[in-house]
Regions:
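Alpha-helical transmembrane segments and their helix-start/interface "positive-inside/aromatic belt" motifs
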Residues: 32-43, 164-174, 375-379, 456-461
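Hydrophobic alpha-helical membrane-insertion segments
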Residues: 40-55, 173-185, 388, 424, ...
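Hydrophobic transmembrane alpha-helices and their helix-loop junctions in integral membrane proteins
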Residues: 100-108, 125-137, 150-433
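Transmembrane helix-loop-helix hairpins at membrane boundaries of multipass inner-membrane proteins
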Residues: 1-8, 25-118, 193-203, 208, ...
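Arg/Gly-rich low-complexity intrinsically disordered repeat tracts
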Residues: 574-576, 586-612
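N-terminal signal-anchor/start-transfer transmembrane helix
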Residues: 11-28, 230
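Glycine-biased, low-complexity coil/linker segments
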Residues: 522-523, 532-535, 540, 574-577, ...
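Cytoplasmic/organellar membrane-interface segments at the starts of transmembrane helices
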Residues: 375-378, 430-503, 508-509, 513-514
Length: 619
């Protein structure tokens, strides 16, 4: 294995940061050179992510391209990177949108362009680091680092209320971060590790969490991620951030940053706390449905085109959360697909709105009308992207929403009915907005002389439309790479599928996020052979386990990597506590309790801390 291959994730993570360092050494007046350097490093990063995507083996279980080296000894923090089907998608999305964001900002950013592109590339490093991290502390570090460049992108290059929007964005996110940090510290106290695979193993093998502790930890992580999504009722920061951010900031905020919330739910909440996830799932599904309907209704009455797109994100990401928490494999696949699809289509919508703002310096729908006459190419691109967001078949928005609605129906018909109503409402507010902007008579004389798309804008929009159509016509390459992730998460969520083996038992095969899978303890060989992830039942119909194809074994296990069922056997509560002395006082535990209490106090008052004179608009 070459050195480049062995450290490919490190290279793709820190290459944008290297570009930011190079820009820092360029003179402020060399604006053209700064833009080209930013584009070069973002394109190189994208090309490497494409290479990783095609080298990614969808038939292999577990993490790929792993990198691990010690960082701290006490506490044990490791520089641990790796990707699976879920994180590979999001790293590819980040690499895809960043160079397009650079191109979108090519002419619009003239004030302090050097600092702008430094922050943009630093933001890319933070986002990729979040998706590649497999150590809880490293994940938290990238999660926090990402806030700094986005704060400055909104606060310096935003619009009239940019400072208010930037502060609100940071306050909400920091409250969630405090909760998550408390949960991370508590998990370390229980498991003795920050390494995610080890934490998962130890939570399975030693039954370390009481039901009450699991509920509180789930809420700590879930609220942090729900704020980032944002899930109703934590959504109020998003419209302000979107409306005030520059176009590139809105593209990356909608396309990537919001996906950190849904990614965190899939990576941490569901695998780490399966019982609590099931317990809170009905409430979360209701909140997701409320977000779908509420976001659509509020978007319908928005006079500002950019704010309309912002509220559409609340509705679309409600679909993602619903798909994850109905616990159906097709719905979960649809949620992951919708994450990628939303990043492309909504990112394209923000690009289109930004291009229109550059021409008229207004986003009010009432200021337009009849633009299809003067901007025929622009209006054609806008129509295709709008139809993709609506969910028209053969475009990318249809696949994810269809899978989510189908899976929701199997869980509860009411979920599917409300989700389908959200699709109808999306068609209403998006097509109505398109009709008011592009059709009818030209009532404002300023609209008669607007220039149509130039070559740069046509290139950007053509790339987005090609991806939108490709994902809608042929989604299988994307769906195939997420199959093992969905199977492993579903296995982990089965309440009675947790393995509690005796420590003297031989090591057992791994499979994705779920390290141990239940087998038929009586040694029967089911016929016909079930597929990987399929339930295995006895003659009476009682579910006895799940089949998985294990392609990676634990060290020195000598296990045959053939399809097998892994036995389950209950163990006494507390087995494996020799990992850490439970009676020994842990100095980190009071800190965790303190952070939880502080965050609990901050959450309901975060909005009150913001400047009252700046408030306004529909919340």
């Amino acid at each position: 294995m070459s050195r480049f291959t062995a450290h490919s994730l490190t290279i793709v993570t820190f290459l944008p940061l290297l570009g930011a360092v190079v820009i820092a050494f360029l003179g402020r007046e060399r604006t053209s050179s700064i833009r080209w350097v930013a584009l070069l490093f973002s394109l190189l990063t994208f090309l490497i992510t494409v290479g990783l995507y095609f080298r990614f083996d969808s038939q292999r279980a577990g993490m790929q391209f792993p990198e691990m080296s010690p960082w701290m000894v006490i506490p044990p923090v490791n520089y641990h990177l790796g990707v699976d089907g879920l994180s590979m998608f999001l790293i590819l999305l980040t690499g895809f949108l960043t160079p397009l964001s650079v191109l979108v900002s090519w002419k619009s950013i003239t004030h302090r362009a050097k600092e702008f592109f430094i922050f943009l590339l630093a933001l890319e490093t933070g986002m990729i680091g979040v998706f590649a991290s497999l150590d809880l502390v490293l994940f938290f570090l990238f999660w926090e680092v990402m806030l700094i460049p986005m704060y400055f992108l909104i606060g310096i290059w935003g619009h009239e209320r940019r400072v208010y929007a930037a502060i609100k964005f940071v306050l909400f996110t920091m409250v969630g971060s405090a909760l998550m940090l408390a949960g991370i510290i508590y998990l370390y106290n229980v498991t003795g590790s920050f390494d995610l695979p080890r934490v998962l193993d130890r939570l399975v093998t030693i039954s370390a969490l009481s039901p009450q502790a699991e509920r509180w930890l789930f809420l700590a992580f879930f609220i942090a991620f729900a704020i980032k999504v944002p899930l109703f009722p934590f959504h109020t920061w998003l419209p302000d951030a979107h409306v005030e951010a520059p176009t590139a900031g809105s593209v990356l905020l909608a396309g990537v940053l919001l996906k950190m919330g849904t990614y965190g739910m899939l990576r941490f909440c569901l695998p780490l706390f399966p019982d609590a996830s099931r317990e809170f799932a009905p409430v979360i599904c209701v909140l997701a449905i409320v977000g779908i309907i509420y976001g659509a209704l509020v978007a319908m009455v928005q006079p500002d085109l950019k704010k309309l797109v912002a509220y559409s994100s609340v509705a679309h990401l409600g679909f993602c959360v619903l798909g994850m928490f109905v616990f159906r494999p097709e719905a979960m696949e649809g949620a992951i697909y919708q994450m990628f699809s939303h990043g492309v289509s909504t990112g394209a919508l923000f690009m289109l709105v930004g291009m229109l703002y550059e021409r008229r310096h207004t986003r009010l729908i009432s200021e337009f009308g009849g633009l299809a006459t003067t901007l025929p190419v622009y209006s054609a691109f806008f129509l295709i992207v709008t139809l993709a967001s609506v969910g028209l078949p053969l475009l990318n928005g249809f696949v994810g929403e269809f899978l989510i609605i189908v899976g929701s129906y199997y869980r509860h018909a009411a979920y599917a009915a409300f989700a389908a109503a959200g699709v109808v409402l999306a068609a209403v507010y998006l097509l109505w907005a398109y009709q008011r902007v592009f059709y009818g008579e030209i009532t404002n004389e300023k609209n008669r002389t607007l220039p149509d798309c130039d070559f740069r804008e046509k290139l950007i929009l053509a790339i987005m439309v090609i991806v939108i159509m490709a994902m809608g016509v042929y989604p299988q390459p994307f769906l195939r790479r997420m199959d093992r992730n969905v199977t492993s998460i579903m296995l982990r969520l089965e309440k009675h599928s947790l393995l509690m083996t005796d420590r003297a038992a031989p090591p057992l095969p791994r499979a994705g996020l779920f390290p141990y899978l239940p087998v038929d303890t009586e040694g029967s060989n089911p016929s016909p052979s079930p597929l990987p992830g399929e339930r295995v039942a006895d003659e009476g119909g009682q579910v006895r386990g799940y089949l998985a194809v294990a392609t990676k074994t634990l060290p020195d296990s000598g296990s045959d990597p053939s399809p097998a069922l892994v036995p389950r056997a209950p163990s006494p509560q507390g087995r494996g506590r020799e990992i850490k002395n439970p009676d020994a006082p842990n100095p980190l535990l009071p800190t965790a309790h303190c952070l939880l209490h502080t965050a609990h106090c901050l959450l309901p008052t975060a909005h009150g801390l913001l400047p009252t004179a700046s408030r306004g608009g529909v919340q």
